[in-house]
Amino acid sequence: MQIYPLRFVPNKIDFDFMNFKKVSYSFSIILSLISLIWISIYKFNFGIDFVGGIVIEVRLDQAPDLPKMRAVLSALEIGEVVLQNFGSERDLSIRFGSSSEENLMKNIDIIKTSLRNNFPYNFEYRKVDFVGPQVGRQLIEAGAMAMLFSFLAIMVYIGVRFEWYFGFGILIALVHDVILALGFMSMTKLDFNLSTIAAVLTIIGYSVNDSVVIYDRIRENLRKYHKKNITEIINLSINETLSRTILTVITTLLANLALILFGGKAIHSFSVLVFFGIIAGTYSSIFISAPILTMFANRKFNKKVITQGKG
């Protein structure tokens, strides 16, 4: 019995992606500008990792239902609330941001009242402390520099594996993806915390992987079809990898959707941001990082790429 691979597009599809190059560039520039303007006006909803907050240590008479307790406290609309065990199962740490001193005692009372009304436990409040942010200004700046150097390292890697202009294409796509992800985070008021930084790094990794698959096919087709121009080769390469691209994005989105629906509040911001970033990364790999190579169509492609390839 012959087994056929799963495909979402016909084998001989010949969609003219390059015909939409100017439209996709304009669309991406507009979205990026909107994101930057929105961020400059409305900023981010910084989580307690960045702004500090209050820690309440409490002991219960029995092990609590943590998922239900997280859901109840998250519904109080007092900002991000982090609930976790420390020591034994009956010892809890409740951490939340302090937006202003006036609301400090009020929010503590709201939490205590909510716990008392919704759970049949005996609560022994042991300590209430103010804690500073886990992520200081210097660490934020160091993280930004690390991301910048990661961009440069990726560009160098792609340049060594392919050619320098391939690295330039991926760099533009990554900057596009990060700007859109940050804009989306600002618009949707997702908590900006350590998990969302991890989400941005995940988006970068996914976008690079998606672009490299198309670049590999472009390099292969440059060696196979010497008489085709670069626009035809890019179109052909995108179409040949389209089934793989669609299959990958669907399976990844489905896995991420499970995290959004069942992962709970603790990873909600991470899951939602990665979901958006996967879509943005797929779009940029097809409509930005590959078409941008046509900027170099008037220069002679390095013969080593066409005849031998690198890596």
From Swiss-Prot:
Membrane topology: Multi-pass membrane protein
GO biological process, one term: protein transport by the Sec complex
Residues passing through the membrane, by range: 23-42, 140-160, 164-184, 194-214, 246-266, 272-292
Signal peptide (UniProt feature, chain positions): none
Sample GO molecular function, one term: protein-transporting ATPase activity
Listed InterPro entries: SecD/SecF_arch_bac, SecD/SecF_bac, SecD/SecF_CS, SecD_SecF_C, SecD_SecF_C_bact, SecF_bac
Keyword Oxidoreductase: no
Predominant location: membrane
Pfam families: Sec_GG, SecD_SecF_C
Record flagged with keyword Acetylation: no
GO cellular-component term (any): plasma membrane
Disulfide bond annotation, renumbered to this chain: none
Keyword annotations: Cell inner membrane, Cell membrane, Membrane, Protein transport, Translocation, Transmembrane, Transmembrane helix, Transport
Compartments, record wording: Cell inner membrane
Subunit structure: Forms a complex with SecD. Part of the essential Sec protein translocation apparatus which comprises SecA, SecYEG and auxiliary proteins SecDF-YajC and YidC.
Family, as annotated: Belongs to the SecD/SecF family. SecF subfamily.
NCBIfam families membership: 2A0604s01, transloc_SecF
Reported function: Part of the Sec protein translocase complex. Interacts with the SecYEG preprotein conducting channel. SecDF uses the proton motive force (PMF) to complete protein translocation after the ATP-dependent function of SecA.
Record-given protein name: Protein translocase subunit SecF
Species this protein is from: Rickettsia prowazekii (strain Madrid E)
